[in-house]
Amino acid sequence: MITETAHAKINLTLWVGRKRPDGYHSIDSVMHSISLSDEITLEKSNEILLTILEGDAPAGQENLMVRAAEAFFAVTELEGGVFLTLKKRIPSGAGMGGGSSDAAAVLRGLSKAYDHPLSKEDLLKVAAKIGADVPFCVEGGASRCQGIGEILTLARAWEGLPLVIAMPPLFMP
């Protein structure tokens, strides 16, 4: 069994450009991982199954963790599946990359479980197909993110920076 930590992220800066033909917006953002996190366990299985142990998250195909596992097995052409558990602490709809970080954790965990069948570059390409924030969440830390979020330039982390994050009672899908 493998345990992965899925850290929330915040946007320290964010510029949003025009909507692209693929439905995404061009962005230029500085993203930073924070200590708030979800916990994911992965265990090899014959099928892809997700159990939510704590918190609120979509199940089945609506969950980015399931999509990440499906994408990993499709690209690697490996037989099998994974039993996933989720302890959800990152609030849904808060813009903190909860679903994206969970998907990234699944990609990292599957890569470890199956002895790294994809290069880092290929893993990031799979991540970009799942969602715009997923490549950053695979890497974590601090990065300038451009394109739709898939073009990463490492930045210096702001360790120890005290932050107060308030979440109003609004949900942003």
Segments from the language model and where they lie:
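N-terminal beta-alpha supersecondary unit
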Residues: 2-79
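ATP-dependent small-molecule kinase catalytic core of the GHMP/sugar-kinase superfamily
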Residues: 2-5, 11-15, 19-29, 116-173
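DPxDG-like acidic metal-binding loop motif
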Residues: 65, 94-120, 136-138
